[in-house]
Amino acid sequence: MSFYESVFIIRQDVSLNDIDKIVDDFAKIIKDNNGTIIKKEYWGLRTLAYKIGNNKKGHYYFLGLDITGNVKEELERKMKLNENIIRFLTIQADSISSEPSPILKNQSTENAPVIDVTINN
C-alpha cells in the first residue's frame, strides 16, 4: 500500500448532498479494495483560474489515501467517467499529514464552510 493525495473539482451547480454521494462512491471503492481514507477535506466552492466548460467556479475536495496502485487507477477511471467532476489530480505522497491542509487553514469560514474533515490513523 502507498499513500496518495487526490484533489478533484466538482461542477459548481452540484448540490452538497450530491457531492457527499460522489465521495461516498469513492470511499466504497477504496474500502472494497482494502484501502483507507486517512483524511478528507472539503475546500469549498472556489473560483477557477480559468473557465472550464461553462464553469467559472467549482467545489474542491481533497482525499488523503492509503491504497494500492490498482485502486488509484480505478478511482481515476471513475473520476473520468463522472460528468460532475471537471478536473482531478492524484499524486503519490511519502505520508499524509494529520494537520489540516494549508488551503483549509487559510480558508475563511464566511467563504466556504468545512463540511467534513476526517483524520484516521
Curated annotation (Swiss-Prot):
The keyword RNA-binding applies. One of its GO terms (cellular component) is ribonucleoprotein complex. The keyword Zinc-finger does not apply. InterPro entries: Ribosomal_bS6, Ribosomal_bS6_sf, Ribosomal_S6_plastid/chlpt, Transl_elong_EF1B/ribsomal_bS6. Keywords: Ribonucleoprotein, Ribosomal protein, RNA-binding, rRNA-binding. GO terms for biological process: translation. Gene3D superfamilies: 3.30.70.60. This is Small ribosomal subunit protein bS6.
